[in-house]
Every structure is written in structure tokens, then in C-alpha cells.
């Protein structure tokens, strides 16, 4: 079996188990059984349940990055808005699993720490996909800030059953505008020129760019 196919099987097995039993059901033997893999193969892909969750995050990251960085002439906030909305699009099939996971999240510091590190890597990738630096002190602060933005937007996403995710867009847009006010401070912390990160194609959601522009005109 090809590695990519085995990895995808693990991702789908994690989703199914989370939907059924939340984190309580996420055990390596169950993941292997659901994925149709033996334990040694699973171990090479995801040696622990936390590693399997990190594998899921990388899978979602890949789906988002495939959409490209957006239009270079767009403001950074608009590029990041588009990238993050692509992330929530990719998470739509995971909504039931995420809801169940949120209800069954145990008070486990090691689990929380492992997932927090993985989330920071994902948010750094989202910034880079939007051609915003994630390196240096300013980059680290941007990553941490985007984690907070994502936490609020994800809560809205889990309660948002609209087809266009309008409630999610509203929260995300508002939080990004709040974060944007810190941009001058971050530039003073890290004044070096930004080296562009080229990922690929054009943005997927023109209507979402229009949403952001319309919100800006309403505020002004």
C-alpha cells in the first residue's frame, strides 16, 4: 500500500472514531482496525493517538495550501481571511467529529500541550500561505495571535450551520480587524523586508473577499 493512501486511511479512521466516541475512542488499536492497517504500519505513520491528531492537522493544512496564497495586491488581512475561510471549508466534513471532540476533551496537560504545538505549526503555515511572515519575534507573536483568532472563529464555526458559513465569516473578520491594529507594533519589532512565500493558485472564494471589503466600507 502506498504511504499516501495509508495516511489518508488513518485520517479517515480518526474522523470516524471521533464522531462515535470522541477522544475516548481514539486508541491506536482502534485506529489501526478502522484504517485496515496493522499496528507496525500505523506506528510508522502515527505512533500515538496524539500523533494521529497531528496527522489530521497536516492533512487539513495540505488542503488549504493547495488553494494558493491569494492575490498579491490584496491587503494582508484579506489574504489571511481567504486562507482561513478555506480552512473552515476543509473542516466542514469534520464538524461532527470536532463537536464530539470538544465535548469529550479530557483534562490532560500532555494532550493539550501536544495539540497546542501542532496548532501553532498549522497557524504558521496559514500565515505563510497568506504571504505573511511567521519567523522572528514578530512572526511568533503573529502565530500566537492567529491561534487566538482561530479559537474564536472555530467556536463560531461549530455552531454555524449556514451553507455559506456567514456567522463564521463575521467572527473571523472581526477578530482579524482587531488583530490588525497590532500590525504597526509588530513591524517595529521585525522591520526586515518580507520574503514572499509562493504557494500556487488564486483564492477560491471571491464572495468572501467581497464580504471583507463590504465590512470595511460599513466601518468606514
Describe the role of every protein-language-model region.
Residues 9, 17-55:
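Helix-turn-helix
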Residues 13-17, 90:
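Short amphipathic alpha-helical elements of helix-turn-helix/winged-helix folds
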Residues 30, 82, 86, 100, ...:
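Amphipathic alpha-helical interaction segments
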Residues 68-103, 107, 117-118:
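Hydrophobic alpha-helical connector segments
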Residues 128, 159-220:
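C-terminal peripheral helix-coil segments that are non-catalytic and often amphipathic
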